[in-house]
Amino acid sequence: MAMSFEWPWQYRFPPFFTLQPNVDTRQKQLAAWCSLVLSFCRLHKQSSMTVMEAQESPLFNNVKLQRKLPVESIQIVLEELRKKGNLEWLDKNKSSFLIMWRRPEEWGKLIYQWVSRSGQNNSVFTLYELTSGEDTEDEEFHGLDEATLLRALQALQQEHKAEIITVSDGRGVKFF
């Protein structure tokens, strides 16, 4: 069921790999890069990587054009994603990051909709059951990494819709 990724037209345009000096053009270019990063990571269910991995990945490195976005420009794109709430730096050096193609609140909403739809309120789940269990195989959050899942559950906890608990084999969550 692997879907193919459709690169935006800009990806085939060499100047896209050089951040433009004109403020308006740069804003449009950064918006296009942000959209591309989120779409690419969503399709590949990629939630974390280092800046160096990013630079070598097809995302920022168009082998056909023999063009790659420089590290400094990648960091500008990533910082733009952070400002929008779609990225969290995992270290002080800003060399590795967590990419969130959906913000934690959005993931929490999707999970809670599934819980309600399937009549699972007042039930306890392990984190594994939520992201790897048979019952969630058709849900978008199936396969979600634990760091993003915990942020989503924390958002639900703040809304008093869930409580993160410790269960015998790790962490779990009770939904209300």
Swiss-Prot record:
Signal peptide start and end residues: none
Transmembrane segments: none
Keywords: Cytoplasm, Endosome, Membrane, Nucleus, Protein transport, Transcription, Transcription regulation, Transport
Subcellular location: Cytoplasm; Endosome membrane; Nucleus
Keyword set includes Transcription: yes
Recorded family membership: Belongs to the VPS25 family.
Designated name of the protein: Vacuolar protein-sorting-associated protein 25
Organism, as annotated: Mus musculus
